[in-house]
Amino acid sequence: MLTQERHALILDKLERESVVYVNDLVNVLETSESTIRRDLNQLDKAGLLKKVHGGATSLNTSF
């Protein structure tokens, strides 16, 4: 799966659920934990999500 495809799927899941977890993304996207973490870092730097311990949250989510 291409990086752009993974990013789109991560953002889609995040939009639906407000929170995504690395372990869930590993299973859904069938890729390694390090790849998911790298993707989350890239999306965080792009300002598309907020990385948290073990996953990420939507920027629209307030806890």
Regions found by a protein language model. Name each.
Residues 2-23, 27-30, 38-63:
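HTH-adjacent hinge/linker in prokaryotic transcriptional regulators
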